[in-house]
């Protein structure tokens, strides 16, 4: 079964053809450079550019896969969560294509896509722990199957990737923040500043994360956390912030490993491409799986892949399904199964 995946939840306009859930025939992405001068995503600009790009990326996905449009068996599209204007463009385009081609439509949750991304290039037996690190989400979960996912912990405020972007914006390190901070950190002293990390000891929050305190310390309290003789440079700020941001993740992950006795972890989302993070995770001495670097960030291959499995089990989505910008369960509710 050949699935056309469409992803437009934020600023990347993506389309892919994936066969039988894991064979990537094409994977096309257009990133919007127009946001760089604002040091962040401008939703109105993002949605407008999606309307210009979406037909092109779908055409290129079909051409690159060397198939005819009539060979598409299923259309999978991200319908939630994300920027509502961007989502509407993708969902409405997918609906129109579904009607025109008389092919079924399956609407996919963006987070389920990220959780599936490592399975595009790895065969991993369930259960395993999953960590999604992106600009919009920081989620620790237990996966019993592709559609049986229990949220253990989540950020109580900023997402990990969001904190990177905000620090980079404040110190004019460039956008997107994650890759630029990683590059600057290479030539910095990671111990120049002892920025705080937040660990929750209450039972109901033992797997949760928080980045607001670290962000505040890094932006407003540099002198307070500066070590003696350390210089205040962007390289040192980046290195020290990056170290604290990832140390923030380690204790909740260790607790989840101990409590579940699961020693397999997948990490996905844009932040998963960070090589410093990967070195830190190695110290956990467990099986760890990542998507390829180009599948860590938003992409349509992960949407097509999970779309194939969801369609086989649950059938097509209603053509009346609408885009949904927020899913409160991700932010506020733990123990919920997706």
UniProtKB/Swiss-Prot annotation:
Gene Ontology MF: a single term: N(6)-L-threonylcarbamoyladenine synthase activity
UniProt-listed InterPro entries: ATPase_NBD, Gcp-like_dom, KAE1/TsaD, Peptidase_M22_CS, TsaD
UniProt-listed Pfam families: TsaD
Top EC category: transferase
E.C. code: 2.3.1.234
Family annotation (Gene3D superfamilies): 3.30.420.40
Cofactor binding annotation: Binds 1 Fe(2+) ion per subunit.
Catalysed transformations (reactions): L-threonylcarbamoyladenylate + adenosine(37) in tRNA = N(6)-L-threonylcarbamoyladenosine(37) in tRNA + AMP + H(+)
Sites where the protein binds Fe cation: 110, 114, 298
GO biological process terms, semicolon-separated: tRNA threonylcarbamoyladenosine modification
Gene Ontology cellular component annotations, sorted alphabetically: cytoplasm
Subcellular location: Cytoplasm
Key words, A-Z: Acyltransferase, Cytoplasm, Iron, Metal-binding, Transferase, tRNA processing
Binding site for substrate: 132-136, 165, 178, 274
UniProt cofactor(s): Fe(2+)
Summary of the function given for this chain in its UniProt record: Required for the formation of a threonylcarbamoyl group on adenosine at position 37 (t(6)A37) in tRNAs that read codons beginning with adenine. Is involved in the transfer of the threonylcarbamoyl moiety of threonylcarbamoyl-AMP (TC-AMP) to the N6 group of A37, together with TsaE and TsaB. TsaD likely plays a direct catalytic role in this reaction.
NCBIfam families, sorted: gcp_kae1, T6A_TsaD_YgjD
Family per record: Belongs to the KAE1 / TsaD family.
UniProt xrefs under HAMAP family: TsaD
Official protein name in the record: tRNA N6-adenosine threonylcarbamoyltransferase
Organism listed in the record: Borrelia recurrentis (strain A1)
Gene from which this protein is expressed: tsaD
């Amino acid at each position: 079964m050949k699935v056309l995946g469409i992803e437009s939840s934020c600023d990347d306009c993506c389309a892919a053809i994936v066969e039988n859930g894991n064979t990537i025939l094409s994977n096309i992405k257009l990133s919007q450079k127009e946001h760089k001068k604002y040091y962040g995503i401008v939703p109105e600009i993002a949605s407008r550019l999606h309307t210009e790009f979406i037909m092109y990326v779908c055409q290129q996905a079909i051409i690159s896969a060397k198939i005819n449009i009539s060979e598409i068996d299923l259309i999978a599209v991200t319908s939630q969560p994300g920027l509502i204007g961007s989502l509407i463009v993708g969902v409405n385009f997918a609906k129109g294509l579904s009607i025109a081609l008389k092919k079924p439509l399956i609407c996919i949750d963006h987070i389920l896509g990220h959780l599936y991304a490592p399975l595009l290039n790895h065969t991993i037996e369930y259960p395993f722990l999953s960590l999604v690190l992106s600009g919009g989400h920081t989620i620790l979960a237990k996966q019993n199957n592709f559609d049986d996912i229990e949220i253990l912990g989540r950020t109580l405020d900023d997402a990990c990737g969001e904190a990177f972007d905000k620090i980079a914006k404040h110190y004019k390190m460039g956008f997107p923040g994650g890759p630029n901070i990683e590059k600057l950190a290479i030539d910095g002293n990671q111990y120049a500043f002892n920025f705080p990390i937040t660990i929750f000891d209450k039972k109901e929050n033992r797997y949760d994360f928080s980045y607001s305190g670290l962000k505040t310390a890094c932006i407003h309290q540099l002198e307070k956390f500066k070590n003696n003789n350390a210089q205040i440079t962007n390289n040192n700020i980046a290195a020290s912030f990056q170290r604290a941001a990832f140390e923030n993740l380690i204790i909740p992950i260790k607790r989840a490993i101990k409590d579940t006795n699961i020693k397999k972890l997948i990490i996905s989302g844009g932040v998963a491409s960070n090589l410093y993070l990967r070195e830190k995770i190695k110290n956990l001495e467990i099986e760890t799986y990542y998507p390829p670097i180009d599948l860590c960030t938003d992409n349509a291959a992960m949407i097509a892949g999970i779309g194939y499995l969801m369609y086989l089990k649950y059938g097509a989505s209603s053509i009346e399904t609408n885009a949904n910008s927020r899913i409160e369960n991700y932010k506020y509710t733990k123990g919920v199964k997706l």
